[in-house]
Amino acid sequence: MSDAVSADVISRLKAVLGEGGWSEDPARIAPKLVEWRDRWSGTTPFLALPRTTAEVAAVVGICAEARQPITIQGGNTGLVGGQIPQGEVLLSTERMRTIREVSVLDDVITAEAGVTLAEVHAAAAEARRRFPLGL
């Protein structure tokens, strides 16, 4: 796949993401193009950094309408390289950092996609609960 994302798609993505919600800066993007074990590397001309699920939906809608592939990246901890773009728009969940709810009654934590496991563990511990997943 090439780094050919149309100027129209990029313009529309910038409009819905607003200031701070995107980057075309190679230095900002570079750490997201290499898998943590340095086995996989890739390219992207555009990094989308949505803060809300509404912004994610808007990015996906724009890209779907334009038939523009997207790679989603969370913590970049995958083991098979699926989080590394090969020319697609890269959508990072890193700014989606809210723990929305800790329900002691239901033993449920609702967290956005960019919340780290360490943060989920801390929220659970604060509620005198344990989140039984680790890496």
Regions found by a protein language model. Give the residues of each.
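Short glycine/serine/threonine-rich phosphate/pyrophosphate-binding segments
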Residues: V56, L79-V80
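Short clusters of hydrophobic/aromatic residues that line enzyme substrate/ligand-binding pockets
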Residues: W22, I29, L79, I99-V102, ...
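Short glycine-biased active-site loop of nucleotidyltransferases that positions the nucleotide triphosphate
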Residues: W36-R39, G81-P85
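N-terminal glycine-rich flavin-associated loop
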Residues: L13, D38-I70, V89, T93-L135
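N-terminal accessory segments
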Residues: M1-E35, T43, E65-Q68
